[in-house]
């Protein structure tokens, strides 16, 4: 089966595992998925990220994070720029997610950045997803 949007698939797998309260999620690796997973780790949405190398493309193991009473840290993830409709943002128009409570993941010339990092570096780019 040919996958037309591997990023949407990755976000959907995280959303589904989070809803089912799974501890660990494994997905096929790619550079952009590694970047998104690292941003989620850096921003405190997931506990840890491991990249398992094999002879093929590799696997990303994501350890999901929950609060003390089992409440979800990730409320939702939303794919913004899709293969059929790309969404770009100038550096002046970088979106804020829930007035700063969430993050926007943006693909820039500096690599994958959050909305705050893109504003600090004064760069725009393709808005990949919102996470809150």
Swiss-Prot record:
Molecular function per GO: rRNA binding; structural constituent of ribosome
Record-linked PROSITE patterns: RIBOSOMAL_S8
Sequence intervals crossing the membrane: none
GO cellular component, one term: ribosome
Domain of life from the UniProt record: Bacteria
InterPro entries given in the database record: Ribosomal_uS8, Ribosomal_uS8_CS, Ribosomal_uS8_sf
A GO biological-process term: translation
Keywords, sorted A to Z: Ribonucleoprotein, Ribosomal protein, RNA-binding, rRNA-binding
A Pfam family: Ribosomal_S8
Job description of the protein: One of the primary rRNA binding proteins, it binds directly to 16S rRNA central domain where it helps coordinate assembly of the platform of the 30S subunit.
Similarity remark: Belongs to the universal ribosomal protein uS8 family.
PANTHER family reported in the protein's UniProt record: 40S RIBOSOMAL PROTEIN S15A
Subunit structure, interactors included: Part of the 30S ribosomal subunit. Contacts proteins S5 and S12.
Name of the molecule in the record: Small ribosomal subunit protein uS8
Originating organism: Streptococcus thermophilus (strain ATCC BAA-250 / LMG 18311)
